Amino acid sequence: MQMDRKTQIIDYDGNMIADLKEWMIRNKLANLGFNYNVVAILGSQSSGKSTLLNNLFKTSFDVMNTKLGHSQTTQGLWLSFDTFEESPVSPLEKGNSTTPINPTLILDVEGNDSKERGDNRLTFEHRSALFSLALADCLIVNLWYHSLGNFTASNYGLLKTVMEVNLELFQQDKNCPKTILLFTVRDWFEEFASIDIVKNKIVEEYLNKIWAEMKKPPSAKKANINNYFIVEVVGLSHAIIKKTEFLNDVENLRKKWINELRPLQYSRNIPSDGFAHYCNNIWNTIVKQSQLDIPSQKEMLATFRCQEIKNNVISNTSKMIKEKLTASSSQPTSASIDEFKSWAEKDIVEKSLDEYFVDASRYTESICLKTSEELLESLFIQLQTIVDNNLNFTQRVLSAKFANELNTMYSVCTSDKNVFLFSKESNLQVHKDGNGSNSSKEDKKDENTSQDKCIRLWSSFLSNADKLEYITFCNFFESYQKCNIEIRKKNKIHEFNYKPSLNILLTSICKDMNRIRNTQFTVLLERTRATIKSRFKNMDNLLITTKNPEEYWNHTLKIVKALQESINNNLTKCFINLKGGGPGSSVAGISNELFDHDEDNTFHVDSPSEGHRSISDNRTAHENKHYVDENLLNYKKIDIIKNKGKYISSVSEEIDKQIKNKKAISELNNYYLDEIMDVLKSKLDEISDNLSSIIIQRFESVFNYDDAEQPRHWREISMAELKKIFRESKNYAFLIIDILQKNIKVELIDDYLPNNFIKDEVIEKGKNKAKRKIQEICRDAQYIQETGGKMSLKNVPLFFWVILLILGWNELLFFIRFFFRLNIILPLFLAAAVILSTLFFNGNMEVLSTINKVVFFLAKSSFGFYRQLQTMGEKVAQVPTAD
């Protein structure tokens, strides 16, 4: 713990050591406010400075071991402290013995006239003396009695430097505290001379002489040394020969410091928590502003005072800036942006400069002006935060406005889900200006349908987004220019940094644009796929009538080519506008982000089926390069706005280049083909899943109907003829498998659908299911043929219905009474009548035939049940007769 009571603050090479603040915190010295003092000691090497401080302030500085010879012990500057815990204030002096004593920081300085430093010693000696003078309330000058009269050993040159610098540092400050110059005369004997004589010699032959030789400013010519220094001289006995007297002298000096010399507060007005930083600044100022190894007193003074004035001005204006910053952070408004320029110019910049130049203009002009620039820079740094808040608010508003306007413009496209009704006219030749403009007649025609309006909007998406982006940038700079400040004293305008907010705006615009763009591309793609799907919706019906694979697949190929041509003619410009662009992309540089080009402007695709994936991969591959290119193009827009030039969009030209690029159009056609074939595959998968149903429909289309497409009358057809029809129908039905397996070569389709693309297990499952149903249909036909007229209600004789009514009369009445009791007979009767009438008039003979069978079965069963009941009744009637 004793070792931690001291620390080196400047090393032998003159470098400031950075841990002074931590040392003060550890020793509880950082929270003293102004309630502390600083003492520094100067003197020749090996003159006993550290020994004196250790005895006077109970420190533990290293001292020289004379038994090992004379050498340099203290290197650089060391700092320790004394809290005077065991030394109460004298009641005679202070009137209150319980008053606490402020801690004192003790600065032990490397000795002068060092042999080890040689000829280079003067630079460090002067720097350390200036540093000590800037910090110390009390500067102890340690010298030997027998050196009085010598030049070097008596520190005459050092005293001259100290007095000159002190005058220049503090002459302008009328309230400047006096520095205590405490001369400790070592090895002093009362027998040689009294202390008054020694003090008189030091004051007259040293201090007054130096003061008289100094060049003083006019305001100080009539002043004397007592206006700037409090001079004290103390004689100390020999530390070895008269050790007891020496210790008594030191103790008396300690009491004198506590009760008489010590200022109540630190005279340099530096709070203890800023002392470490203050030391660092003082030392760096001394080191950096030295000329010929000796600081220029005038520049030192100007630097010190201008910095001090600057800091005071900043401190005075910071409160207002903080209040404005709080307001701008919590709830910025358009009004606060408009008001910023006014109060920032008048209340901050102009007021601060006026306050600064009142005091600083008396010092060196170059340093004064340089420090004023530092003052403005400091103010602008604080104001920049408010400007950032204002610009961030502006960019949020503009970003939301951009997204809302672009989204509203394309909302009609999002709501329309209908399939495309393609026209024969190519969309590639329409709206060449990218804005949907052509002849007035064509425009009027385009606006007649929602489809044409959507296509026109999609074809000009990038151009519309580019215009909105430019308008957004213009609005942003209009708000930004309201933030720039005019400095009237310097006749210039300060422009704040807008790039962070602009970059956020750019990113937000890019994200919103790409989000809307991707949404519109999804809508376009879904409608395109729905259109393709609608063209393929009759493919399963075509399978019912198709008689060979060539007919079916040639018809499918015609549909594919027609779709590809229609999409190319009508939607290519839409796809160029809406497809492409990765995160961070903007409307600028569209030709780069659409496809992957090489030097001859060609594309690289592995295969037609890879087209979609290849285009998507290119978006990621060029993302970083595009971001840089697009930023450059966006900043060109900014330069045009700043220079008030005219902006001409190049987006339409880039899109026209893509349309004229044969390779690009070919690549898009491959992409269209990918989408068409994806839908075709889905349709064929759907057909494969319903294979049995289609086989059955094909079978029934031949089996149940003749060549004239009339229903067959099976009761008029022989069994041999029925079997022949069955074989022909079955062969025709199962021909569908050969058709779907595509065992022929088909242009374009072969690249996507191989031969025999339907799995064997799917085919077998469909065939087995279809066979069972076909056999069931055949059995029904055979049954109808075998029963012939017996199954017809028309062939039932009239007398049969009369007999049925007579024999079942009681049962009929029983059921009628029962159902009428439940109130359901009439609704059931009406429902049955409606169903039978509907079936009859719709010609649904199969259902009527089934109902006919059910009725006959019920009639037969009822008649048998009736005969059984009648027999049982007769037997019961015969039993009483027998009895």
Curated annotation (Swiss-Prot):
Domain GB1/RHD3-type G: 33-279
Membrane topology: Multi-pass membrane protein
Uppermost EC category: hydrolase
InterPro entries attached to this UniProt entry: G_GB1_RHD3_dom, P-loop_NTPase, RHD3/Sey1, Sey1/RHD3-like_3HB
UniProt-listed Enzyme Commission number(s): 3.6.5.-
Main location: endoplasmic reticulum
Coiled coil: 673-693
Membrane topology, Lumenal segments: 817-819
Ranges in the topological domain labelled Cytoplasmic: 1-795, 841-883
The organism's taxonomic lineage, starting at the top: Eukaryota, Sar, Alveolata, Apicomplexa, Aconoidasida
Function in brief: Probable GTP-binding protein involved in generating and maintaining the structure of the tubular endoplasmic reticulum network.
Swiss-Prot/TrEMBL keywords: Coiled coil, Endoplasmic reticulum, GTP-binding, Hydrolase, Membrane, Nucleotide-binding, Transmembrane, Transmembrane helix
One cellular component term from this protein's GO annotations in UniProt: endoplasmic reticulum membrane
Localization of this protein: Endoplasmic reticulum membrane
Highest rank taxon of the organism: Eukaryota
Name the UniProt record assigns to this protein: Protein SEY1 homolog
GO biological process: endoplasmic reticulum membrane fusion
Binding site for GTP: 43-50
Listed SUPFAM superfamilies: P-loop containing nucleoside triphosphate hydrolases
Parts of the chain that traverse the membrane: 796-816, 820-840
The species this protein was found in: Plasmodium knowlesi (strain H)
Family: Belongs to the TRAFAC class dynamin-like GTPase superfamily. GB1/RHD3 GTPase family. RHD3 subfamily.
A GO term, aspect molecular function: GTP binding
